[in-house]
């Protein structure tokens, strides 16, 4: 079973499209900037997995810029 589960992640960000977009952007940033991340430890070795763990932990959120 994958950690974190899609059901738990959708409690943090309400749409699958937004979830994938946020995770992909964070993963790309971590890869390009050699960012070690904001959590003390990660279960995943891959950038996308680390981004999803950050979303699950509440350290990475979606900002809605609509006015």
Swiss-Prot record:
Cellular component GO terms held in the UniProt record? DNA-directed RNA polymerase complex
Q: What are the record keywords, sorted?
A: DNA-directed RNA polymerase, Nucleotidyltransferase, Transcription, Transferase
- What is the superkingdom listed in this entry's lineage? Bacteria
Q: Which Gene3D superfamilies match?
A: 3.90.940.10
Which reactions does this protein catalyse?
A: RNA(n) + a ribonucleoside 5'-triphosphate = RNA(n+1) + diphosphate
GO molecular-function term, one example from the UniProt record: DNA binding
The family database entries (Pfam families) matched by this protein are listed as: RNA_pol_Rpb6
Is Nucleotidyltransferase found in the keyword set? yes
Entry-linked HAMAP family: RNApol_bact_RpoZ
Q: How does it assemble?
A: The RNAP catalytic core consists of 2 alpha, 1 beta, 1 beta' and 1 omega subunit. When a sigma factor is associated with the core the holoenzyme is formed, which can initiate transcription.
What family does this belong to?
Answer: Belongs to the RNA polymerase subunit omega family.
Q: What does this protein do?
A: Promotes RNA polymerase assembly. Latches the N- and C-terminal regions of the beta' subunit thereby facilitating its interaction with the beta and alpha subunits.
UniProt-recorded name of the protein: DNA-directed RNA polymerase subunit omega
Q: Which organism is it from?
A: Listeria innocua serovar 6a (strain ATCC BAA-680 / CLIP 11262)
